[in-house]
């Protein structure tokens, strides 16, 4: 699982290293590499790529691409660790949106944990002059779109091959990126080409390691360890981009992680209790 967090953090580092390129151009190259990996994986698994739930797959691709685009915008314009922290709100939106899409319920105590997490975001915006309200809203919107995309993935998990779902996200991102890039194309130079490839490669590696961890470990444990990525974000931000953090901003990041982690732990325990009660245990 730690390999997954390192891989995703490295992908974010390379996004920031090519921040002089248009965000949609970065999306296009990221999805180009991802599409190649997915087709290879599907061919190896002897699975079809078209899918049978076209509407849900398309919507998953649209919301996933939108989330990715706005996340890249935040990474380009605010400190790396701050952008990653705001994106960590996505599980909260996933749970809230599931109330409407999947008819799931949220316990009262979970709302308290969500409030703790959002208060952390306000801390970051209030005490870090590099994080404007504009990019804060963009980051939150990215997390919201991720929440919608995750719910669509959950609705498809019993009906489509996982790589088919991922592939449609990559294809939508590739097509959208190509269209937008026609109007704002900027030729990458030198190391840019390598960085763009590594964005896609590390993102795909992160997904592979994450999937492997979910298959071997409890989902709650994986979710909690995933937030250790913030440590790598802080370290790489300081080492490569000379991004220091005030104590107040660090406190805000901790509040976000604590709020989300407590929500994950509580939700998993409630699910286990409900299963025991359902079986009469």
Where in this protein do the model-derived segments appear?
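Glycine-/small-residue-enriched transmembrane alpha-helix faces in small-molecule transporters
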Residues: 1-25, 130-155, 275-281
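Membrane-interface interhelical linkers
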Residues: 1-6, 35-59, 108, 158, ...
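Hydrophobic/small/kink-forming positions within alpha-helical transmembrane segments
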Residues: 5-9, 39, 61, 65-69, ...
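Hydrophobic/aromatic residues within transmembrane alpha-helices
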Residues: 18, 26, 30, 74, ...
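Alpha-helical transmembrane segments of compact multi-pass small-molecule transporters, enriched
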Residues: 33-37, 86-100, 115, 171-176, ...
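Helix-helix packing/entry segments at the starts of transmembrane helices
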Residues: 83-89, 156-171, 207-238
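Loop-to-transmembrane alpha-helix entry segments
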Residues: 87, 103-123, 129, 133-136, ...
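C-terminal-most transmembrane helix of multi-pass membrane proteins
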Residues: 231-281
């Amino acid at each position: 699982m730690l390999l997954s967090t390192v891989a995703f953090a490295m992908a974010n580092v390379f996004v920031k290293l090519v921040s002089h390129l248009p965000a949609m151009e970065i999306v296009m190259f990221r999805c180009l590499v991802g599409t190649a990996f997915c087709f290879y994986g599907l061919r190896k698994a002897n699975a079809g790529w078209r899918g049978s739930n076209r509407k849900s797959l398309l919507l998953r691709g649209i919301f996933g691409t939108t989330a990715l685009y706005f996340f890249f915008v935040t990474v380009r314009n605010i400190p790396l660790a701050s952008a990653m922290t705001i994106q960590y709100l996505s599980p909260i939106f996933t749970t809230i949106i599931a109330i409407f899409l999947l008819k799931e319920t949220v316990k009262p105590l979970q709302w308290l944990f969500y409030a703790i997490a959002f208060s952390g975001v306000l801390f970051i915006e209030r005490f870090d002059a590099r994080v404007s309200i504009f990019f804060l809203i963009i980051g939150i919107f990215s997390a919201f779109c991720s929440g919608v995309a995750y719910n669509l993935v959950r609705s498809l998990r019993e009906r489509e091959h996982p790589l088919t779902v991922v592939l449609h996200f990559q294809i939508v991102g590739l097509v959208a990126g190509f269209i937008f890039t026609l109007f704002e194309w900027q030729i990458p130079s030198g190391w840019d080409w390598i960085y763009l490839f590594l964005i896609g490669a590390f993102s795909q590696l992160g997904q592979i390691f994450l999937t492997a961890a979910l298959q071997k470990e409890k989902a709650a444990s994986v979710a909690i360890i995933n937030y250790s990525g913030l440590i790598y974000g802080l370290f790489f931000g300081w080492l490569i981009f000379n991004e220091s953090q005030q104590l107040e901003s660090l406190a805000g990041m901790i509040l976000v992680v604590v709020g989300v982690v407590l929500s994950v732990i509580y939700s998993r325990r409630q699910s286990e209790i409900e299963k025991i009660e359902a079986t009469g245990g």
